[in-house]
């Protein structure tokens, strides 16, 4: 579909529900129509290095995958996959089932949730407590254990892959210098050999963890914005469906995103509460090496967030992006200082 077609559907309310006009939220890979009762996600016809939505058949497949995978943690939120068909009035509608009309695209049908209950918003309001973190751990630990990958069925990234992923930040040294000062490019130069050394020292342990069953077919994008904290319990949504390689990972890498996000938001005690509760349910940290790996993965997740914030700041020069960059820079510096003290030990 095109943006024009999607916006026409939204304006006309041509979808299941009350029929009022919907708000359209656009990302680089999808449009999401937010109605009063429901939300509908339509995938853009794009092919990128990490996904392929270029044909209707591919989009239909990944819509079904999105519903299937997200029902693991949000069964009441992900309702179905609906077809998009032309209407007799010359427009298009979501949810028609007219066998005489062609299906031109597909939409993921979701229950509309209360955005004010998103965890990132609640963290900024100081409205998240230890009980919320315990409830989240009680949801995620059994989920991860149930989706652990058997030894021999998963081959993790190579040492070169790990380094290349982290080193993606380093070409942003000039932008980082403009925003964060001279300390940023100096730190990047220091971190390059540190990361190489760390990966060389710990890659064998990562392989051992694969054999020990600590890699999972998980969520893949586990951060606070993808969590609703509801009265009846947490709902974790919007997992990665389009590339299983981004979803199959060491559980420490999965948890690191959430822990880093909470720590970057200035609530390290809540991160500790979550990890303690989680480890009681699944002791996936067996030795000190694993603690160091968790810090490395937190550093990697902060690295990626910093890079995105630098990109947004360079393009838009907005203070919000600058604040996010400073926020992630702060926690990244702390993680890397910890690794510098422990690498080689």
Where are these regions (language model features)?
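ATP/Mg2+ or Mg2+-diphosphate-binding catalytic cores
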Residues: 307-345
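Conserved ATP-binding subdomain of kinase catalytic cores across diverse folds
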Residues: 3-219, 224-304
């Amino acid at each position: 579909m095109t943006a024009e077609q999607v916006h026409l559907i939204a304006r006309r309310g041509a979808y299941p529900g009350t029929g009022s006009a919907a708000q359209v939220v656009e990302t680089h890979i999808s449009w999401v129509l937010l109605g009063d009762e429901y939300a509908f996600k339509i995938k853009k016809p794009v092919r990128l290095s990490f996904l392929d939505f270029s044909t209707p058949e591919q989009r239909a497949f990944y819509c079904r995958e999105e519903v299937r995978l997200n029902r693991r943690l949000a069964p009441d939120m992900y309702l179905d996959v609906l077809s998009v068909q032309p209407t007799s009035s010359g427009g298009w509608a979501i949810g028609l089932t007219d066998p005489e009309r062609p299906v031109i695209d597909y939409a993921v049908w979701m229950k509309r949730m209360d955005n004010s209950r998103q965890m990132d918003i609640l963290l900024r309001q100081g409205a998240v407590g230890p009980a919320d973190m315990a409830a989240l751990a009680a949801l995620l630990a059994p989920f991860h254990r149930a989706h652990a990958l058997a030894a021999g069925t998963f081959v993790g990234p190579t040492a070169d892959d790990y380094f290349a992923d982290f080193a993606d930040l380093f070409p942003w040294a000039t932008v980082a210098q403009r925003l964060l000062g001279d300390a940023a490019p100096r730190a990047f130069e220091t971190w390059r050999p540190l990361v190489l050394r760390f990966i060389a020292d710990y890659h064998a342990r990562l392989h051992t963890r694969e054999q020990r069953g600590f890699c999972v077919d998980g969520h893949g994008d586990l951060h606070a914005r993808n969590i609703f904290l509801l009265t009846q319990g947490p709902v974790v949504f919007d997992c990665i469906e389009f590339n299983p390689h981004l979803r199959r990972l060491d559980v420490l890498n999965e948890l690191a995103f959430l822990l880093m996000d909470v720590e970057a938001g200035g609530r390290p005690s809540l991160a500790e509460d979550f990890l303690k509760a989680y480890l009681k349910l699944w002791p996936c940290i067996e030795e000190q090496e694993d603690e160091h790996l968790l810090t490395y993965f937190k550093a990697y997740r902060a690295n990626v967030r910093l890079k995105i914030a630098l990109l947004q700041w360079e393009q838009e020069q907005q203070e919000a992006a600058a604040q996010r960059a400073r926020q992630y820079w702060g926690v990244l510096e702390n993680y890397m200082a910890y690794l510098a003290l422990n690498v080689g030990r």
